Amino acid sequence: MFAIIETGGKQVKVEEGQEIFVEKLDVNEGDSFTFDKVLFVGGDAVKVGAPTVEGASVTATVQKQGRGKKITVFTYKRRKDSKRKKGHRQPYTKLTIDKINA
């Protein structure tokens, strides 16, 4: 059984026991989190939401709060001696999917 959930403005396909990385959630490590925006449930019985599946939820456990790999942003204006270099690390949450309730 699998489900498609919406989190952080993105749609993620999840299965039980899977580890996923999502945009940062305001939850402590080790806590349980429930996703209510389930868009699709697949498996033996397929359920398609319009826009979400009624009564469906996905429960996950927070494994880690972290920051992603650093990216460098460099902008310049030619012939003007104008340069700017910035770095950014996107925060993320690592989850383990425990149960899909459909």
Swiss-Prot record:
Domain of life: Bacteria
SUPFAM superfamilies per record: L21p-like
Coiled-coil annotated spans: none
GO cellular component: cytoplasm; ribonucleoprotein complex; ribosome
GO MF, one annotated term: structural constituent of ribosome
Residue spans of biased composition, Basic residues class: 79-91
Record's keyword annotation contains Ribonucleoprotein: yes
Keywords of this entry: Ribonucleoprotein, Ribosomal protein, RNA-binding, rRNA-binding
UniProt-listed Pfam families: Ribosomal_L21p
Annotated segments matching region Disordered: 79-102
Function (record text): This protein binds to 23S rRNA in the presence of protein L20.
Quaternary structure note: Part of the 50S ribosomal subunit. Contacts protein L20.
Protein name, as recorded: Large ribosomal subunit protein bL21
Species of the source: Staphylococcus saprophyticus subsp. saprophyticus (strain ATCC 15305 / DSM 20229 / NCIMB 8711 / NCTC 7292 / S-41)
Taxonomy of the source species: Bacteria, Bacillati, Bacillota, Bacilli, Bacillales
